[in-house]
């Protein structure tokens, strides 16, 4: 009896794995990209001295081929009954810059916030659904941890000591999301077969100008590509 139950459970696991696949794609920007702005760090000599070259804002990272980095791509309105990852996400403060600039987590997933700088920072998270917090991190404090318990749209985490320091995060109630790499590619893993709405969010375009489309995951795979482009000024009200 136990052997039969074990085989049944094993078979169920294999079937579950077989019908879950990857959603892959690439996000591009069409047109001439905006010039990256210089981050002025003169107010804190420690920050300024940590960069041999000019530090640039990361709000719009696009390569020569138009591939767009730091875009959150996710499946919308999906159900998930599993648990958040046990591996913490990491938000580092290095050279007085948040890294990663854009990231996403599951509700209930631990976030380790690191301070590798020899200067004072403070972590000021500004969610609307989850609890706002503002925690100081002197140079002697190398790590603090936090958890956002509820799903929430993108919000900013900033440093009030260094106003140029900003990171953006979104909290999901499922694991079907990714952030594009420097070549614009993304991979959302373990997606069950089915039809979904997939959405792409980019910082400068914001939540009112996301890109979306319908995809069907069949046979364990699907592809979705997105193109962001500067809107016609005449069409902007």
Where are these regions (language model features)?
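Bacterial N-terminal signal peptides
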Residues: 8-16
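Bacterial N-terminal signal peptides that target proteins for export
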Residues: 1-8
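Extracytoplasmic copper-binding redox domains, predominantly the cupredoxin/blue-copper superfamily
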Residues: 20-235
């Amino acid at each position: 009896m136990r052997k039969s139950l074990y085989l049944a459970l094993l078979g169920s696991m294999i079937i579950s794995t077989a019908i879950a696949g990857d959603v892959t794609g690439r996000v591009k920007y069409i047109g001439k990209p905006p010039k990256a702005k210089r981050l002025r760090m003169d107010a804190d000599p420690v920050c300024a001295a940590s960069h041999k070259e000019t530090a640039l804002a990361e709000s719009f990272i696009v390569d020569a081929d138009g591939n767009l980095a730091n875009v959150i791509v996710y499946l919308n309105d999906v159900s998930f009954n599993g648990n958040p990852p046990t591996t913490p996400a990491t938000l580092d403060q290095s050279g007085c810059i948040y890294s990663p600039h854009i990231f996403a987590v599951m509700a209930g997933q631990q976030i380790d916030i690191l301070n590798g700088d020899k200067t004072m920072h403070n972590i000021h998270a500004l969610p609307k659904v989850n609890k706002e917090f503002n925690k100081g991190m002197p140079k002697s404090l190398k790590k603090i941890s936090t958890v956002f318990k509820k799903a929430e749209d993108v919000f900013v985490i900033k440093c009030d000591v260094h106003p140029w320091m900003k990171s953006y995060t979104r909290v999901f109630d499922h694991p079907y999301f990714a952030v594009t790499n420097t070549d614009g590619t993304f991979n959302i893993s373990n997606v069950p077969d089915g039809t979904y709405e997939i959405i792409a969010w980019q910082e400068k375009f914001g939540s009112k100008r996301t890109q979306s489309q319908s995809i069907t995951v069949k046979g364990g795979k699907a592809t979705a590509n997105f193109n962001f482009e500067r809107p016609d000024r005449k069409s902007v009200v």
